[in-house]
């Protein structure tokens, strides 16, 4: 079920309900331009005729002290006091330009100032179930009220996790007046909301390049501010094995260095850091594909095609889609013993109820290098690699589940790949889709599978940076060979298979459930935006994720449409620009989205002046 259905918030002024026309929505934004948190509520109560609410020199806390709620408030309040934040990108009226011969525009009213309300002296927090565990579909809803005559900020939530979201909203709404040197909230208001989807996350890949624990925590801080709640941690890959495994300590010989290893203590520290911010960590040990480093240290026979030339200088003979090659030999009995032992240790480290088993991009040519697979095919002349993979699925899922019960996730390839696929995947396995966009989402949900959306054409954050494999003659071209027609170096992808670069608008405008029936929509658990790390490490991971991941955050929390079903892209522009500034003020190195001129001149950098240009 679509989680909480965004709680069906209604927007009203004291004088009545706001019409949901674009002009009315813009007018509403102008009445309190500093109240523009991300994710943006679809609609909310605004007391537009009331004045500012100043904060007392000290705001006291009145609420639960357990489950980390008090600690979350202290982080919120200390951030407010330290940053002395004032929004850097405010919403403005529809610009008036010198008209083209038949163009005209009408001026917009400015909001009227009103006398300030009662000073805010305390925050009062009520949580119905303070012991609620952080888990899939936990209630994350909250209400946040600042009334004109009250001296308290009122927060109500079902669980500690909703209260945390209220704090991150409040952080973005309290601003600082340099002239009076006082903190204030521009207008009394009430926000009451919850997420559309229970899984809202990003994928961090530490297998291609190592990502330090401090940088992982930086991503968690940004996630918490934007209400993302799942870190999909793709820990290992063929290129390296950075995870400490006590059962097989030799695996970390394939880490890039002894310093580039996640110890058990570090893993637990990251998980706890995430939990304190309302974020679950879902581990992925990608198997049976993308498996060479680490595995081969246990037994070289565990890995097929590990010593092959990945492209064979002739792509029809490739053994991997990128260097270095290697897949678990699924016809070798010892593979299953090692998998079970490894899962037992990893599942004891990661407490989440979901566990990702990988399963993407299996290459048939790789198994031509396996004596065990060759023998199996000879002994089963009527069977194919699809049948062998089915045997792998039927053998591993029950065995792993018996060790420690989890809900397993596979990449969709395990069922839909044209290369190698199983014929049957249990319906209780979640499938994460990255190919085929709307078509694959429809195909999976119509067949009864719960789905996590990671469509590469919309959500892949590493795309559009050209190729990274070296000694590539395709770049050695001095003149355009096909003028007027895009090709590799001239208007083409330049070696990035998933080009172009995914802008925040591309992410935000993705209506991934638009072609689904009601029952099919119930199978969408949410979305995760991957950032594969072939060209990513500590130096650039944060600006690659942020602020684009914030567009995903709003899409999955409150949606990209207003309550009348119209796209909110026009008003999202100032909101995400401002959120980027808020991230950088917090020491999170998010990339700029536009020249600063655009922040200072709202909508002067739009492609079209019509606020309804983005249709849906």
Curated annotation (Swiss-Prot):
Q: Where, by residue number, is the active site?
A: 361
UniProt xrefs under InterPro entries: Beta_hexosaminidase_sua/sub (IPR025705), Glyco_hydro_20_cat (IPR015883), Glycoside_hydrolase_SF (IPR017853), Hex-like_dom2 (IPR029018), HEX_eukaryotic_N (IPR029019)
Q: Which GO terms describe its molecular function?
A: beta-N-acetylglucosaminidase activity
> Which reaction is the catalytic activity of this chain?
Hydrolysis of terminal non-reducing N-acetyl-D-hexosamine residues in N-acetyl-beta-D-hexosaminides
Q: Which residues are glycosylated?
A: 333
- Name the protein family: Belongs to the glycosyl hydrolase 20 family.
Stated name of the protein: Probable beta-hexosaminidase ARB_01353
Q: What organism does the record attribute this protein to? A: Arthroderma benhamiae (strain ATCC MYA-4681 / CBS 112371)
Task: Tell me the classification of the organism that encodes this protein.
Answer: Eukaryota, Fungi, Dikarya, Ascomycota, Pezizomycotina
